[in-house]
Amino acid sequence: MTENILNSPGGMRSYLDSIAFQLEEIQDRIKGVFRQWAYRPIITPTLEYYESLTTGIGEKYKKQMYKFIDYEGNILALRPEMTAPIARTVANKIDELCLPQRLSYRAPVFRYEEPQTGKNREIYQIGVELIGEKSPGADAEVIMLAVESLKSSGLTDFQIDIGHAGFLNGVIEELKVTDSQGEQIKRWLNKKDMVSIRDFTSRVEIKNINKLLGIVRLRGKKEVLQRAKRLINNDKSKKALKDLELVYEYLCDYGVDNYVNFDLTLIRGFEYYTGIVFEAFTENLGYTICGGGRYDSLIYQYCGKEIPAIGFAIGIERVRLGLLNQGQELETPEIDVMVVFSYQARKPALEAIKKYRKQGLNVLQIEKEEVDQEFIKKHLKTGVKKIISFCEYSSNQKIKVIDDRGNIELLTPGGDLP
């Protein structure tokens, strides 16, 4: 028992100083973009009823949920993602809301990932949901916002893959396979696993094997959509391709098409997606930094009303790793002025501190009887730009000013402090 006193549970992280500051800074930049796009904040409980959180998310994420039983015998769980809690909240207030709603959040989510994956079990996310609007323009707006959000974080080298749940659903229906076979084929297509597809089609009679193998290669720029049209012959997939073409027009008009690829085998882990889906990647990271899509049936499962919606979530820790991989210098907490003072000199020191803070400077105050060279060197290494010492003020009426190179200047009070 005692060995756990100093440790966090597996997959949970504690962040101090520079890393914590950087994660906050990334969130603040992205949140600023959300605000510019008129997305308003929403806050939902970290702990909810299990049955509420499992609506539409799929078996994989149900198995990864942290579950509890409260004192009244209810099964509760920590949220594994934010879309279902937001859908429940909107459904609960649907008669009071003016649609469409543009909502934003930043919150931790919890998934019991297997230890060998090396993934965190507490994941810091920031994201948006556009609820109550169904159009190519709405889909494009959310993708454009994802691009601008990632750019605001400082990322320069990233791509967004766009697909459509309806495209693969149409392909599977055309193959006339069972539901379980269809889901397996989707996973193979998504992984570009041609070996498994060939093996499966050698055991099960499927006429359109060449068509299926051709679909595996449907990834690239706009020409992919034209190639796809020649491979499919069902209305559902055709409509999906038309949706993608219209969304792409908006992305071109806004000037973010250079960030976009099409991947028509793309599927997302959550079962509630019904239309456009997308994921963002950056070089040298083996996982997505952002993902989202359209879910037009989820809110119906809560309130019985058809309310279309689309959104995305960004993994803050993954964005930070992406920035480091791109060789970017991440900011560290800055202290503009550190004021050190003895008890006897507290009054003039506190007056100076108040003045600096009114000027918008970050001020660290430390009460200490004397300042030596070791103290100065240690704090200048942490990024302190200037040290002002009142420690000798009571004896010689002098103020010691030390700049970021360690140069010392003695000042007499009366004029303005530097």
Curated annotation (Swiss-Prot):
Keywords: Amino-acid biosynthesis, Cytoplasm, Histidine biosynthesis. InterPro entries: aa-tRNA-synth_II, aa-tRNA-synth_II/BPL/LPL, His-tRNA-ligase, HisRS-like_core, HisRS/HisZ, HisZ. Belongs to the class-II aminoacyl-tRNA synthetase family. HisZ subfamily. Required for the first step of histidine biosynthesis. May allow the feedback regulation of ATP phosphoribosyltransferase activity by histidine. The keyword Cytoplasm applies. The gene is hisZ. This function is generally fulfilled by the C-terminal part of HisG, which is missing in some bacteria such as this one. Coiled coil: none annotated. GO terms for molecular function: ATP binding; catalytic activity, acting on a protein; histidine-tRNA ligase activity; transferase activity. Pathway: Amino-acid biosynthesis; L-histidine biosynthesis; L-histidine from 5-phospho-alpha-D-ribose 1-diphosphate: step 1/9. This is ATP phosphoribosyltransferase regulatory subunit. GO terms for cellular component: cytoplasm. It comes from the Bacteria. Pfam families: tRNA-synt_His. It comes from Halothermothrix orenii (strain H 168 / OCM 544 / DSM 9562). GO terms for biological process: histidyl-tRNA aminoacylation; L-histidine biosynthetic process. It is found in: Cytoplasm. Heteromultimer composed of HisG and HisZ subunits. NCBIfam families: hisS (TIGR00442), hisZ_biosyn_reg (TIGR00443). Gene3D superfamilies: Bira Bifunctional Protein, Domain 2.
